[in-house]
Amino acid sequence: MRPLSIKPTSLDVARHATSVESFGNHRPPISPWHSPVPYLFGGLAAMLGLIAFALLILACSYWRLSTSGDDSGERVDEEKESRSGVKAASAACEEKVLVIMAGDDLPRFLATPAANKCMCGHEGRMVIFKEDGIGAGEEKMGDREKAKENEETTSQ
């Protein structure tokens, strides 16, 4: 085998690179990613960006819905409803409830809730007015048969 020839200059460079004194003067660079601060601000920026994107989508969808009503035939429907005296607000206020029944093939139905409170002030009683206007009789809700008889007698 042939001996390696090492130049004295490269040997000095190797000694200088591995000496203890060089480690004390030069530390390896510290990466900023070893700190939680960039992750914190990066996460906050991502969340704010996502919120801004969602608000932009909501604004565009609201704008699209408000402008699409002008071009469609809703004006014709509104004119027909105003002529007949029916307001669109009454149809919009009608409340529907989804009812799920067990055991059927299609167990979903839309139901209109019944009023559970009397708005006339005669709670629990049925008020029957006579046609001649002489008087009014009040009966309990359980006495529906008597109320039907009274209606039949007043109509004859």
UniProtKB/Swiss-Prot annotation:
Membrane topology, Cytoplasmic segments: 61-156
TM region(s), chain numbering: 40-60
Keyword Heme attached: no
Compartments (UniProt record): Membrane
InterPro entries associated with the record: GDU
Membrane topology: Single-pass membrane protein
Remarks, miscellaneous: Overexpression of GLUTAMINE DUMPER 4 leads to free amino acid levels accumulation.
Membership in a protein family: Belongs to the GLUTAMINE DUMPER 1 (TC 9.B.60) family.
Name the record gives this protein: Protein GLUTAMINE DUMPER 4
Organism: Arabidopsis thaliana (Mouse-ear cress)
